[in-house]
Amino acid sequence: MKSHLQYLELFRAHRDLIDAAAPAFMGAPREEAARLLEAQGLPDSRTERYKYTDAEAAFAPDYGLNLRRLAPQADPYAAYKCNVPNLSTSLFFVVNDVPCPAPDSSRVLLPEGVVVEAFSRAVHTHGEILQRYYNRAAQTDRDFRTGHDGVTLLNTLLAQDGLLVYLPAGAQLKAPIQVVNVSAAKADFMSVRRILVVAEAGAKGAVLLCDHTEGSQRYLTTQVVEVFAGDGAEVEVYSMEETHRQNTRFSTL
């Protein structure tokens, strides 16, 4: 069986569960993503942008997923550390693909109106922003020879939550927003992460994405980061990774 078919079967068998545990706006593009993924599958090394990475092979093993959106057992703000020397940051954690509620100390340096929040919580206060921008860039991500990017389609198919970073017009971050993604599970696990960065006109700031692993399990991550900048806005996005050889990560910006 081709790798993508097992995920299409999973999606169709558990569509109600996937949608029930996700904000409604995330369900809208799933059917189109399923149609395109079924038509073209996942890329292999014959696809130029995956010349050295066989996605078809990477997604073949049977990984667990958190479709019921169970919260991490440990408080990541107490259990994990990711310090960047000589750099003060506003720190936020995502464990596997669950954005974790942040303590007040993580927001001390954020200017008024800046939002760093899970889609599932931000939808109640910034639903219009999420509706307007979610999947807008991802749906145009494509390999010009084979069509849409299969890994991005798979992410859209299964993503149930994400992290919104919103900078209102004119906001200027005093320190970078640091998002620490931690893969931690008792069995081989697949994370489906989504990050949406929206900077309105004149806003300025930096986002630092850090990836770490716990334990010796095999981890597979598909991550899609969408960034939108208004007139005169400046957004810098950095990515750092400190993981082990059993970790495979597909990240699309």
Model regions and ranges:
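N-terminal amphipathic, basic helical "cap/leader" segment at the start of enzyme domains
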Residues: K2-H148, T152-L153
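Conserved beta-strand/loop scaffold segments within soluble protein domains that form the structured core
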Residues: A122-H126, Q131-L253
